Structures are given as structure tokens and as C-alpha cells.
From Swiss-Prot:
Organism name: Methanothermobacter thermautotrophicus (strain ATCC 29096 / DSM 1053 / JCM 10044 / NBRC 100330 / Delta H) (Methanobacterium thermoautotrophicum)
Higher taxonomy: Archaea, Methanobacteriati, Methanobacteriota, Methanomada group, Methanobacteria
Superkingdom of the organism of origin: Archaea
Keywords, in A-Z order: Flavoprotein, FMN
InterPro entries: Flavin_Rdtase-like_dom, Split_barrel_FMN-bd
Protein name (Swiss-Prot/TrEMBL): Uncharacterized protein MTH_574
Amino acid sequence: MILENFKRESLIPLPVTFISTTSKDGIRNIAPYSCVMPVLRPFDLICVASAKMRDTVVNIKDTGEFVINMPGVEMVDKVIPTASHVPFDVNEFELADLKERPSKKVKAPGIEGCYAWMECKLHNIYEDEYEGFPYLLILGKVVHLEVNDDIYNPEDGSWDIEKANPLMMVESDRGMHFCTVSDINKFEPYGAMFPDGKDPLAWMYEKRETRE
């Protein structure tokens, strides 16, 4: 079946994240974002694609900070309230009945009830326009990363996907279909991709762990 080119997003399962920011006047904002991806490995950069006219974008430009919050499926009912178009001076934590979680390295608070939090400083913004529609790619540098203890194994860096139950989404002509992921019990080391069986980036992980 041949599809229209723009429907490529319908075939890619996307994470659902909540990005929390604070305006320069201290107003709290939350918005759901799915076009979010880490930039390679083991960098500490993360990329967010956004329409230009968003309160989140204004706050990130003004303050240079934001938090990417990772919710489980139990928070699916918070997506629409935080996506609603409301006046700039509305506190969306109160609107969505969400509790603030104090951040360690940025002023913007995280969101209680999520399973992971990425506190970010603005690294760069790339602005462009496509067919008359302005958009941005926001690059953030993760300055503090935290995850619930009960889902993460510090011994090998793995995490319990089924316990975290990450909220995800696929799109269709009618709207958003929310879903999650499951473990298929298959594992391969990074080195399996290379002829000598060694991960050429292993030294970078060791260097970072030593530095931290």
C-alpha cells in the first residue's frame, strides 16, 4: 500500500513526554511533546522538534532551561489538559492537577509521578520554515538525569521497561492512539555490530563515569 509521504509519522511509534518550563515571570508551563530524540550515544544532548508558536518555546528562549519528564501509561489522562491552548499566564500544573517536583540544576520544576526526569540547559536552536510553516529544532544539554530507583539497574544500565510502562503514541488520520512497549527478551551488545566484537565508543562511557 502506498501512503502519502506526510503520513510517515503514522508508522513510527513515538514517546510521550511532558516538557515543563518556567516563564521569565515565574509562570509554570507544561506541554506534551512526542518529537523528542537523544542525539547519538553517549552524548548528553537531546533534540526536541516544535512548532514555533508555543509557550514552551518562548520560555526556553527566555530562560535557557527546561525539563523533559517521562510519564508512564497511568498519566495518559494528563496529555489533553496540558496540550490545551490557554492564556500564557495560566499555571498548567494547577490546570492539569499535577504536582511540582523540585529540580536540582534548573529552576523549572519537574513533574511528580513520572518515572524519569531530564533537566536540560539550552544548547542551540535551529529555526526554519517548511511550506510556509515555521518550526524549530531545540537542542538541550542534559545537566541532571534522574530515574525511579525501582526501575533502574545501576550494575548494567538497564531498566525494567514493563515496570516503567512508558507512555507512547502512534498517529492516524483520526488522531492519537496511545500505547506502550513490551520486552521481547532479546539482547545484543553494541560490539556485535562491529567485526572485532568491540564497541568503539566503550572508552567514552568509561571516561564519563570516571569524570562523574
